Each structure stands twice: as C-alpha cells, then as structure tokens.
Swiss-Prot record:
Name of the protein: Nicotinate-nucleotide--dimethylbenzimidazole phosphoribosyltransferase
Native species: Sinorhizobium medicae (strain WSM419) (Ensifer medicae)
EC number per UniProt: 2.4.2.21
Matches recorded under InterPro entries: Nict_dMeBzImd_PRibTrfase, Nict_dMeBzImd_PRibTrfase_bact, Nict_dMeBzImd_PRibTrfase_N, Nict_dMeBzImd_PRibTrfase_sf
Gene: cobT
UniProt keyword Secreted, yes or no: no
Pathway the protein takes part in: Nucleoside biosynthesis; alpha-ribazole biosynthesis; alpha-ribazole from 5,6-dimethylbenzimidazole: step 1/2
Active site annotation, chain numbering: 305 (proton acceptor)
Short name of one Pfam family: DBI_PRT
Length: 338
C-alpha cells in the first residue's frame, strides 16, 4: 500500500509515469529492415510488429520466452441468471487447463508458448454489481498487485487471457460505464446467452451501470465497481509488463475491457500492446476501435482463455524470425534496387 494509505495510489503513480519506447532500438530495427532481401514494405504488418518488438523490449526483435497468462475469477452477478452455465464451470475449466485438455493447451503446444493459470479466489465470487461494488478498493488493488506477478518468472512476450463464467456481462458493463451508448450495443451472447437469459444479461448491465453511475469518471473505480478479479489481475499484468519492457498481446472481449481501464487512465498505457484478434462477440470490434487498435486476426472465435492472443503470438514470433533470420542484400549477394 502507498504511504498515503489509499490502495490505488501506487497504481495511479505508475500510470502517470509509464516508460516510453526505446527510440534507438526502433531506429536500428528500421535500418536493418531496409537491408533485408525483400522490397520495402513487402512483409506488411510483420515489419511493423518487428519494429514494435524492438521499441518495447529495447533490443533487436526476438521472442524466446513467450507466455500465456490466464486469470480465472467468479462473479456474483451470475446470481442474476445472465449465463446458461453455472459458476462451477470456472473451477472445472481451471482443472481442465491443468490437465492439458483445453483449446489453449493445444495452441500453446503448437506455437511453443508457456502457460500459467491463476486461480483468483474462485470460492469467493465478487459482489453482485447490480447491488454493490464487485470489490473493495483494497481487494481490487491487491488483485492488481497479484496480477503483476504474472511476469515474475521471466518472459519476453506476454499473452493475456481469462476464464470466468459471467465475465462477458462484466466486460459489457465496463464498456458501457467507460464509453456510454446502450447496454444492447455492448452485450452479446458470451457463452451462449439467448432469449430470456440474454434479456436478463442486458437488464443486469443496465442496472449495474445505473447503480454506480456517480463513480464512473474514475477508471479505477469503474474497474473495482463493475469489474472482477480477473479484470484487476489482467490490468496489473499489463501494467507490470510495461514497467519491465515486456510487449503484450491482449486476447478477447473481456481482456480488452481490462485493457480499456488502463487506456482510460492514461491514453499511452497500451502502446506496448497488440490486440490478438477480434472475437465474434458483437461489442468487441467497437471496444477495439475505442482503443485505437487494429486486431491481428479475425477468425470468428469467442472462447476467451487467451486463445486468440496465443494464435497471434505465432505471428509475432514469425515477424521476429523474419527480421532476425533473413539475409541482407549484401549477405545474399542479391542486388538491391537502383
């Protein structure tokens, strides 16, 4: 906790003092790119990804220790009947991750990515946001700090994902609280909500934002009132990665909502981040546009679990490999343009 005694103060200070990109590393990467055996710009966005890696790691583009971090949390708002699945599925899926049986496990194997799963007090759901704040300031700050530990073991590319029954309701509430509009614009099917369940989901988002409306000018208050433990932990992980020069790939609708909290607190807070994919959740593209980002992939996915970010990590690894492994015109004896 900060010297002032207010739990969020340390995070506010970090958000005011974010490190910027490494200009020298970026210039060096651009210079090397101009010497590689290809026409300028021929690798399209792969080139920009390589430059992004250089700028935010401070060294030549490379991905040697990529990590997918999944944060799992449960939500009191599920008592409002906003999802067809019981909250017990969150813990069951955490066990599935540990056993290697989920989609994210297979994608991590395919792309040689590390995987860590963080169980965030699943037996103690957050407060029902239609009736009370999801978390106290102290609990929210502590969960952010816990999320910051995701990179403690060392990584040079962090993929952020989540698992939590009810958390697309949470994400919709955050987006409505931050950006306005209507609940209908931000609420989607999530794990398959339709009919009366979807109506209850929309109603819950409306009620939650109305209840907390006098406190939504502060992004950290949006997070603690409308969010959840996985939201706070993902925000902490993204922030820690920035401080430690670790580029980040953000996954789907829920992870994007966590990122939006940081962006609202500091417009430069996500400069070290890419959006891995746009999901089929209806509000996701709108949320990405609010962040000023362009997703790497659009595969019609809506699973969460870091799956889209992990797939995008394969592209980032390829971008780094091309930049570092291609021959220059001089090395290959190939004539450059005149």
């Amino acid at each position: 906790m900060s010297a002032s005694g207010l739990p969020f103060d340390d995070f506010r200070a970090l958000l005011r003092n974010l490190p910027g990109p490494d200009t020298a590393a970026l210039v060096a990467a651009r210079e090397r790119d101009g010497q590689l055996t290809k026409p300028p710009g021929a690798l399209g966005r792969l080139e920009e990804i390589a430059f992004w890696l250089a700028a935010w790691t401070g060294r030549p583009p490379a991905v040697n220790r990529p990590l997918v971090a999944i944060f799992a949390g449960n939500h009191g708002v599920t008592r409002q009947g906003v999802t067809p699945f019981p909250a017990s599925v969150t813990a069951q899926m955490v066990e599935n991750f540990a056993a290697g049986g989920a989609a994210i496990n297979q994608i991590c194997v395919a792309h040689d990515l590390g995987l860590k799963v963080f169980d965030l007090a699943l037996d103690y759901p957050t407060g029902d946001i239609t009736e009370e704040p999801a978390l106290s300031e102290r609990d929210c700050a502590a969960t952010m700090a816990f999320g910051m530990e995701a990179i403690a073991g060392g990584t040079d590319l962090l993929c952020i994902g989540e698992m939590g029954i009810g958390n697309t309701t949470i994400a919709a509430a955050i987006n409505l609280g931050l950006y306005g509009g209507t609940a209908e614009e931000w609420v989607g099917p999530g794990t398959g909500s339709e009919g009366e369940v979807l109506k209850r989901k929309i109603a819950a988002v409306k009620k939650a934002v109305a209840l907390h409306r006098d406190h939504l000018s502060d992004p950290l208050e949006v997070m603690r009132r409308l969010g959840g433990r996985e939201i706070a932990a993902m925000a902490g992980a993204i922030l820690a990665a920035r401080m430690q020069k670790v580029p980040v790939i953000i996954d789907g609708y829920v992870a994007t909502a966590a990122a939006a909290i940081l962006k609202a607190a500091n417009p430069a807070a996500l400069d070290h981040c890419l959006i891995g994919h746009v999901s089929s959740e209806p509000g996701h593209m709108r949320a990405i546009e609010k962040l000023g980002k362009t997703p790497l992939l659009a595969l019609g996915m809506r699973l969460g679990e870091g799956t889209g970010a992990a797939l995008a990590a394969g592209i980032v690894k390829a971008a780094a490999a091309c930049h570092s492994g291609m021959a220059t015109f001089a090395q290959a004896g190939v004539s450059n343009k005149v």
